[in-house]
Amino acid sequence: MSELLFRLNFLLLLLLSCVSLASSFFSFNDPVVGLGACGPHQIQAFTQFKNEFDTHACNHSDSLNGVWCDNSTGAVMKLRLRACLSGTLKSNSSLFQFHQLRHLYLSYNNFTPSSIPSEFGMLNKLEVLFMSTGGFLGQVPSSFSNLSMLSALLLHHNELTGSLSFVRNLRKLTILDVSHNHFSGTLNPNSSLFELHNLAYLDLGSNNFTSSSLPYEFGNLNKLELLDVSSNSFFGQVPPTISNLTQLTELYLPLNDFTGSLPLVQNLTKLSILHLSDNHFSGTIPSSLFTMPFLSYLDLGGNNLSGSIEVPNSSLSSRLENLNLGENHFEGKIIEPISKLINLKELHLSFLNTSYPINLKLFSSLKYLLLLDLSGGWISQASLSLDSYIPSTLEALLLKHCNISVFPNILKTLPNLEFIALSTNKISGKIPEWLWSLPRLSSVFIEENLFTGFEGSSEILVNSSVRILNLLSNNLEGALPHLPLSVNYFSARNNRYGGDIPLSICSRRSLVFLDLSYNNFTGPIPPCPSNFLILNLRKNNLEGSIPDTYYADAPLRSLDVGYNRLTGKLPRSLLNCSALQFLSVDHNGIKDTFPFSLKALPKLQVLILHSNNFYGPLSPPNQGSLGFPELRILEIAGNKFTGSLPPDFFENWKASSLTMNEDQGLYMVYNKVVYGTYYFTSLEAIDLQYKGLSMEQNRVLSSSATIDFSGNRLEGEIPESIGLLKALIALNLSNNAFTGHIPLSLANLKKIESLDLSSNQLSGTIPNGIGTLSFLAYMNVSHNQLNGEIPQGTQITGQPKSSFEGNAGLCGLPLQESCFGTNAPPAQHPKEEEEEEEEEEQVLNWKGVGIGYGVGVLLGLAIAQLIASYKPEWLVFLFQSRNH
């Protein structure tokens, strides 16, 4: 069973135990579900509480949601409203009138991002509090220390910051999960955390904790059964006191910077999961690890382990089912000893850099093997032939980056195969016809090879069972074959396909992700764009207009039709796509006015209209300011927009006004199908005038924002309200007709890296505040009517003089015109200037400008259906693996 399933089952058992122990009061006054047993004041308070929120998302048939009251006193004892509420949880909420409340479940609600009200401290009889995935941010209020009766506290998957000082006095806690937040700081030996001696489940994973070593005091929490400190910044050696935790069944330390030998865990005889991947552990693997009595999951991948692998003969009785030794530096023969672990179901040996070819026959003893990952290895070509042998039980085989040049016929012998990854090899010719007849084949990743086509007719894929098919970056040409009837996810990005996109695409009702970008397709866009969550047709030769067929609540999240030959207007029915987040129609011939109506789309974050024939004003007539609630990237360069921008133009751009610390932002990559540490990614791309160069960018930190209005006919003053957009990293207003002064408020853009105001009619001086912008790497104010001395500051004086030329009244470095009547010395040696410009180019790609979202959100329904048919033993693990 995979790590994730282990954890879910373990947490469920603990919660049941917690509820049982924490709810002894039920024994004399059993709570009654529904409002019938509730007192009138409690009914009124509950009604008021629900009225504070939008409850349309509530599943009223969910028997687990509801309110429970004490049959004797009428007091609300338990309240469970999971995935039910939308709105703001305010400090004066009626919730805080339930002073007898013992159990409160508010996870997975759509709360407006805000801090946790300190009034929770008034509910001092709480024993169970679940507030995970609720959008909470900021520090946990100190009033939480009043909740001394708490036995279970779940705050995971929020945006919480600060330290764990709020756990002071919570000495009855048995379950504490604060994972996937932004808690930070050093865990000192005197931390309140180490006073929680009843803890059985402690998850600190995916935060920003740090320490020169894991505190020895963890060894004092000797009731722990699960400990997770993964994805933090711990470094140094794991203390020997970890061996005191003799009740541990699961230990997770991956994705830190631990060094030294592997931790001493031989005493932890109850251990079933040991996850130590992606650290800097060195030395050899103790052979005793392979004979621990209950250990079923061992992940040591991505370390600096070396030496030989020794598996005792007694390991034949080992319970080890999941083993990851990939990305280490072992020596000698490693497959032979591993073949003794006959109960293995999942084996990951990727990127071991063996000095000899791996013969697949060596795995013949592993009769229960479901998943085998040999990516990055040197595979014996002979062992890939039909005459070789590999366990027929295999459901997943990964042979990426293996320098394979011939399609492995051994796949014919695997009737249970569901997942095959042959990515980034050198396989040429046609994809064999027999592959599509494998009865259970569901996911095929053969991107980045040299395939030219398919054996068989254009109908060869239609009746296959494949749901995910990735053909990215091959040499496929001709007409696109008809896709499988069952397909959910298809990418043929970056090939040579041509002709019309077949209309049969529209009949594939389960197809939610389609990427045909970077090909040579001609003709119209198929008339069914509403069918998709993600549709990417970028850089083809498509003609006609974008179909205006988006029905109400169409599921579309991302539409990219940039770099085609499209004409007509932007579809008005796009307003029906309430889930739309990314829209790019750049580099076409669309002739239309600015789509003011799109500001009604609540989730739109990226809007790219670059290089079309859009025209008219940017100020919405009689509609107030141009406010987009979530917009972060607006790229309208190279059009014919006219008019001026009113002073309040940027006032209601809420998302661009917010700023986060960089470690709080998430790189969000569009179109990602996650198979644990294995990803298939198709990035949304945009072209941006960024730091003086035109380039294609693929990613953006989701907490950043960019604006490009260059190459239009805009006039008037630049609004001072631009200074409200504190998340801006790039602003390009060049090649317009702006007049007046450079706004003083630009000094408020503390995150700005690229500022281009060139080729306008700006006058006055350059504000001194711009010289204080410490992240400003590129600045261009050339060809205006500026005067006075150029502000001095590292970020400005380091710019090339071309950034200030064409302003007759400017003086001072880096120009040679002195402000004191004599020529200024050269700003820098020409060679140094060239080196600086070269260095500037090298840093351009440190942070891309584009946006995307994991398909864990975008393709949840489609992939959930897919997962439901898979055996979780290997598939769920794949959701935990590393990206190669």
From Swiss-Prot:
Lineage of origin: Eukaryota, Viridiplantae, Streptophyta, Embryophyta, Tracheophyta
Spell out the SMART domains in the cross-references. Answer: LRR_TYP (SM00369)
Residue ranges that the UniProt entry lists as topological domain Extracellular: 25-847
Q: Where are the LRR repeats?
A: 98-122, 124-146, 147-170, 171-196, 197-223, 225-245, 246-268, 269-292, 294-318, 320-344, 345-365, 366-391, 392-413, 414-438, 440-463, 464-487, 488-507, 508-529, 530-553, 554-577, 579-601, 602-625, 628-652, 702-725, 726-749, 750-773, 775-798
Q: What is this protein called?
A: Receptor-like protein 39
Report the subcellular localization: Cell membrane
Q: How does it sit in the membrane?
A: Single-pass type I membrane protein
Q: Which UniProt keywords apply?
A: Cell membrane, Glycoprotein, Leucine-rich repeat, Membrane, Receptor, Repeat, Signal, Transmembrane, Transmembrane helix
Q: Which organism is it from?
A: Arabidopsis thaliana
Similarity field: Belongs to the RLP family.
Where do the record's glycosylation annotations fall on this chain?
59, 71, 92, 146, 190, 208, 244, 267, 304, 313, 353, 403, 463, 520, 576, 732, 780
Q: Which SUPFAM superfamilies match?
A: L domain-like
| GO CC annotation terms, alphabetical | plasma membrane
- Tell me the leader sequence span: 1-24
Kindly list the residue ranges recorded as spanning the membrane: 848-868
Any Pfam family from its record, for instance, is LRR_6
Q: Which segments does the topology annotation call Cytoplasmic?
A: 869-884
